Amino acid sequence: VIADINGEEQMYPASMTKIMTTILAIENLKDLNQEITITNDMVADLYVQDAMQAGFQPNETVKAIDLLYGVMLPSGAECCVALADTVAGSVSDFVTLMNEKAEKLGMTGTHFSSISGLHREDHYSTAKDIALLLRYAIKNDTFREIIESPYHSTSGTNIHPDGITFYSTMFKNLSDT
C-alpha cells in the first residue's frame, strides 16, 4: 500500500462480498465438478429483492465450477445461494463461516450478513479489509483464473443444454471507459 485515505472507514461492500463467498466455496467444496440443483426455495427471495442473477433457473442442475463463474462474472445471486447451501447447509451458516474467515484474515472492520452483497444495515466492511481479502483470495489459482476471465461458457444443463455464456461485468465496465 503506497497511500491510504479513509481505508478504515466503514462502507457497504455490495458485490465485493462475492469475493468472500467465492473463496470460501472454492476452499470448502471437495469437487468443483460436483452437480448442484438450484431449488425454488433458493431463489424465491432473490426475485422479491430484485437481485442480480446469472440466468440459472429453479430445478436446474449446475456444476459447482459454473456456479463460481456465475458468482464472479455476471454477479449471480442465485449462484451464491446454491453454493452457500451446498457448503454450509444454509445461508445463515455460510454467513457464520464468512465472519469466521474474516476474523482469521484480520478483517477487523468487517461484518457479513449477506452472501451476495444485498444491502443490510449490519453488512459492512472497509477498503483496507477488502484489500486484505482480495490479497488472500488472489493467491488461490482457481479464484484467480475465474476473476481474470473475460467470459465463461458453462457446461450444458438440464434446462440450458447448450450452457450459458457469462461475460465479466468488470471487463465490460473497463471497456466502457
Residue ranges with predicted function:
Residues 107-108, 119-177:
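Domain-terminus/edge residues, biased toward the C-terminal soluble/receptor-binding domains
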Residues 1-128, 135-141:
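Active-site-adjacent loops and short helices of periplasmic peptidoglycan-processing enzymes
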